[in-house]
Amino acid sequence: MEDMMKQILEKLNTIEKNISETNIRIEKIEKEQELKRKVELYGKEPEKKLHKENIEKLSSSIEDKIIQNIDKKLKKIENVEEQYQWKNIVKINKPLSVGEKYMENFKKILVYLGEKHPKLEELYSLTDYNKLVADIYTDRNLVISAYNYGLLQVLYIEHPSQLELFDENIKLAYMKFRNVTKAQLIYMRIYSAMAEPYDKGVIPKIEIIKFGITYSKLKYDEVYEHQPIEKLDLKKFISQKRALGILVIQKEIENLNGNVWLYSNLDGRLILSNHNKAENVEVKNILSDWSKKLSIPEGNYPRCSIKNPMFTGKTMEVLCELSKKQINMRHICNLCSKMKNVQIQDPILPEYEEEYVEIEKEEPGEEKNLEDVSTDDNNEKKKIRSVIVKET
């Protein structure tokens, strides 16, 4: 009887082992199929294949490479006073709030971009505002870090794998755009009003991402000298750049004239591409609401995905003053009358030169026209509500 029980137990163990091995093989096959699907969708990486676990590892440590380089620089500094300044940047032992953590990482990336670290074995350019201009040779962690903090100007895309660390909406928009062009060089231009930290968190960035084609890469050879990052009033700097970014976005929307393909309108971000024959009423209404929201920040416009709060009171003051200096720039806020005698110094609105070719192929499918529910100024005033965060 005991021998029979032993035999039964052995058979059960064998069956359990076989089931376990079968499950492992099934899981392996599923992973291979998923990897094959991604390769078919996004293409193979030209140099090194990134597996799923490696991508997750890269994504989880986006800022680590930048932070490590700053820590190495700190160890090499012999001057005690200068070392103290760098320790103030890192602040390893002090617990930080979400807003403070954002500012620390933002400062590190600014330092990193400004130094053009010689050990990086990569090719990239910087604009006069120290924003990154990246291509296929640029380190991808640096590209996604610069993008996350509103410091990426242009990404020249020669292969889909360059977007592997970006979110799905950007990747899908790129694939749709690539399907209607045979161009070898596609650019992704970002018009961004960087995120703004305050005492309770971070106000998300506002941005337009525009895809287009070009025959050559623009390279910014001259980078203006800036005030040392260690001496910079970072809150004031971010307020000025966010306000300036809002004006840049507003100007770009006006230049589009509604002739675009719109891929996404979510969470304060538009993803689009130029099209000189696109006349979709729904898209024009969305762009109209975006333009109104940027011109009248305290208004409420349902087709605009910018969420409140839109900025802090300090940024509102900067935006109000800068708007007065722009020709044909509409702006209305509750500070307009109070800001008459306030002078705020900030760079003029930058002019960006872009070389692109518009896609003339029609997008398949019929256009769906929605009723235009635009409001006049009287109705807008009735909808006014606060979008300003008061800093403590």
Swiss-Prot record:
Organism the protein comes from: Cassava vein mosaic virus (CsVMV)
Stretch forming the signal peptide: none
Family per similarity comment: Belongs to the caulimoviridae viroplasmin family.
Keywords recorded for this protein, A-Z: Coiled coil, Host cytoplasm, Translation regulation
Gene Ontology cellular component list: host cell cytoplasm
Transmembrane region(s): none
Protein name: Putative transactivator/viroplasmin protein
BP term (GO), one: regulation of translation
Miscellaneous comment as given in the Swiss-Prot or TrEMBL entry: The inclusion bodies are the site of viral DNA synthesis, virion assembly and accumulation in the infected cell.
Coiled-coil region(s): 1-88
Superkingdom field: Viruses
Function: Enhances the translation of downstream ORFs on polycistronic mRNAs derived from cassava vein mosaic virus.
Lineage, broadest ranks: Viruses, Riboviria, Pararnavirae, Artverviricota, Revtraviricetes
Subcellular location: Host cytoplasm
